[in-house]
Amino acid sequence: MRSSATKGAKLKNSPRERLSSFNPQYAERYKELYRTLFWLLLISVLANTAPITILPGCPNRFYRLVHLSWMILWYGLFVLGSYWEFVLVTTQRVSLDRYLNAIESAIYVVHIFSIMLLTWQCRNWAPKLMTNIVTSDLNRAYTIDCNRTKRFIRLQLFLVGIFACLAIFFNIWTHKFVVYRSILSINSYVMPNIISSISFAQYYLLLQGIAWRQRRLTEGLERELTHLHSPRISEVQKIRMHHANLIDFTKAVNRTFQYSILLLFVGCFLNFNLVLFLVYQGIENPSMADFTKWVCMLLWLAMHVGKVCSILHFNQSIQNEHSTCLTLLSRVSYARKDIQDTITHFIIQMRTNVRQHVVCGVINLDLKFLTTLLVASADFFIFLLQYDVTYEALSKSVQGNVTRYK
């Protein structure tokens, strides 16, 4: 926080103004990037998943205080709504559903707090991140494909919008249009998932941007190594340094979002197993579930599976680009010792595991992690079944004893 404040103070004087006044190309690229990301940034600021300082023209303290007040007000209403949902709705459910829903709601409260805390912490360095992206793209001669980026953003926001509309509609329907129950349930379960989805849209975009840049570097390296008679050592070294910077940036992105990722995995894991358990109960007792509840459960299953798979997919895409580059380097060999030494150094760098895809020290973000989640989910689901059978047997035993004593 202290270093962020120092960076923020430096920012007021210039990266933006200095570079734009001395480098017209930088100024044009900077405006182009903002135009491309504008709707995502605006929606993120309104949803409290990005600081208001990231918007052009909003760097001063007044806007920060307004945004902080909005975050505190929104979070206070959210926590209050979650409390009343627990008191008026969750406590009326059967034992197992009550416990799982209460834990899930508590995780959402903590998760939203972590997102907003991160938003406030990055108020100083978020504008500098935009500056660094433009500067590094200029250094590596990378031109942003605005249309492709806009399509990616539109797809992410479209998926969030579809989920929001369907979840709100079916939530109201399953609560039989009882207004207070519907509002409390939407506040406690739907809104946190909408907020986290908007937050992770930024995460997906950052990772996808890294993968696109890695691909471009690998294409440039391939041209240098295979299409030229004598590769230029300076160019290979430059590409190697750009790859190292992207690896460091990947690590920084995952470290920034690591607690949010952990809380999302825990929340998705609990809700996924709860929905599976409710599906099992619906199959065992068809009278317990109607059509709307089935559709609602399928919607939540799809949403949670989609979130987990998206996080792993975008990390895996970076690892695939990394492997492609390493394969290319391993295929070539040169008689000149200076070139071969440079290639060897590059290979060692690519093979060095700096744990850029590891979060919270234990979760390795690749598609293999799905196997771990499925095994854990199967074990937890078996536990829920055993608990349900035991609880039902104890309930019948207590009920029988009460009847006998009467």
From Swiss-Prot:
Glycosylation sites: N147, N254, N401
Domain of life of the native organism: Eukaryota
Gene Ontology annotations for the cellular component aspect, listed alphabetically: axon; dendrite; membrane; neuronal cell body; plasma membrane
Annotated InterPro entries: 7TM_chemorcpt
Keywords per UniProt: Cell membrane, Glycoprotein, Membrane, Receptor, Transducer, Transmembrane, Transmembrane helix
Segments traversing the membrane: 37-57, 70-90, 100-120, 155-175, 190-210, 260-280, 365-385
Extracellular side: 58-69, 121-154, 211-259, 386-406
Cytoplasmic compartment residues: 1-36, 91-99, 176-189, 281-364
Organ and tissue specificity: Expressed in the adult abdomen and wing. In larvae, is expressed in neurons of the terminal external chemosensory organ.
Molecular function, one GO term: taste receptor activity
Localization per record: Cell membrane
One biological process term in Gene Ontology: signal transduction
Membrane topology, from the record: Multi-pass membrane protein
Similarity annotation: Belongs to the insect chemoreceptor superfamily. Gustatory receptor (GR) family. Gr10a subfamily.
Function according to Swiss-Prot or TrEMBL: Probable gustatory receptor which mediates acceptance or avoidance behavior, depending on its substrates.
Protein name: Putative gustatory receptor 59f
Organism: Drosophila melanogaster (Fruit fly)
